[in-house]
Amino acid sequence: MSLSNKLSVKDLDVSGKRVFIRVDFNVPLDGKTITNNQRIVAALPTIKYVLENKPKAVILASHLGRPNGEKVDKFSLAPVASELEKLLGKKVNFLDDCVGDNVEKAVNGGSDGEVFLLENLRFHIEEEGSQKKDGEKVKASGEDVKKFRQQLTNLADVYVNDAFGTAHRAHSSMVGLELPQKAAGFLMAKELEYFAKALENPVRPFLAILGGAKVSDKIQLIDNLLDKVDLLIVGGGMSFTFKKVLDNMPIGDSLFDEAGAKNVENLVAKAKKNNVKIVLPVDFITADKFDKDAKTSTATEDEGIPDNWMGLDAGPKSNELFAKTVAEAKTIVWNGPPGVFEFDNFAKGTKSLLDAAVKSAESGNTVIIGGGDTATVAKKYGVVDKLSHVSTGGGASLELLEGKELPGVVAISDKK
């Protein structure tokens, strides 16, 4: 799967055509009120670009929440239609389903770039391919899925995918439209461009920064990255498992991952073989309980963490060491914070690392933040625009970094 050779919306001739855009309008709702419209705003450049190029109609499709394959009013995309109308300054026709005769009739009657927003794709079991019933997974029949995909295909002449956050799912709207041209929207294209920069052709030294709790969740990630990077910072809860296994450091009540511990020595041996320098924290900010108001103390790697205490952040010496490592790198991918940044007393390590990452990006290096918690950190401190790229897809970016193919990306046409 090449990331750098995919058809882009800019390569399409959309004039007079029905353009189906798979967007990510999975926004947080309080009742019928959208509490954060960022995902809608993020899709505007692709929608506006298509509209400027004189299509017959633009058909927007998304999921919202987890309705589990049936119609659930609180997951309706109706509130999104009125928000989108405001943001676009153009009428948006909201349709109360995403497939079927009425939908086809409406869309085919569209002209002069009329905009249609389909109802939540996941109101149909065929979108995800299964639903949970009484705790059991029930699959949609192959026939029904095929029919649903054909009905979606009937709505369009060309297909654009701008939903990177769902790219790791082989859902019908991501992989099932059989059209001659399937292109990446601007959001998707930017994600692919930056991940290609890191994974296919990095400027070296290439550094990966990994945090998060469990080693066992990240084994495939570490294993894949050890074939690509020159430097690896392991921080967060995961670092205690490394410190205990490698240095026999006492870790008190800090996180210890029994399952992951079995792999630490293999991973370190692979790093040695591949000449990858692994950087671990050397001191810690500790707490007497997992709580924002916990008593705090410090510990060095030599003394270790006493019983009944736990490490919740990297200490000042580790922060210096991490900043120095960041300063050596020309390409950086960061997935997972080095401390419990949600609690102010344990956010210094994360803030310090973020400052170093911003400094690196400002001096012209490529700094990519994987989605999830690390993206939340970048937003919290208001530095999203100061970094090269903050991914919109936690799960999708993780799977890319693990070396997996993303079905939604594979489905996009390659440039001829």
From Swiss-Prot:
GO cellular component terms, alphabetically, are:
cytosol; mitochondrion
Q: Which residues form the signal peptide?
A: none
Q: Is-annotated flag, keyword NAD? A: no
Report the EC number(s), separated by commas if there are several. Answer: 2.7.2.3
Q: Which transformation does this protein catalyse, written as a reaction?
A: (2R)-3-phosphoglycerate + ATP = (2R)-3-phospho-glyceroyl phosphate + ADP
Known PROSITE patterns for this protein? Answer: PGLYCERATE_KINASE
What role does it play? Answer: Catalyzes one of the two ATP producing reactions in the glycolytic pathway via the reversible conversion of 1,3-diphosphoglycerate to 3-phosphoglycerate. Both L- and D- forms of purine and pyrimidine nucleotides can be used as substrates, but the activity is much lower on pyrimidines. Negatively regulates the biosynthesis of acetyl-CoA from pyruvate in the mitochondrion.
Q: What is this protein called?
A: Phosphoglycerate kinase
Annotated source species: Debaryomyces hansenii (strain ATCC 36239 / CBS 767 / BCRC 21394 / JCM 1990 / NBRC 0083 / IGC 2968)
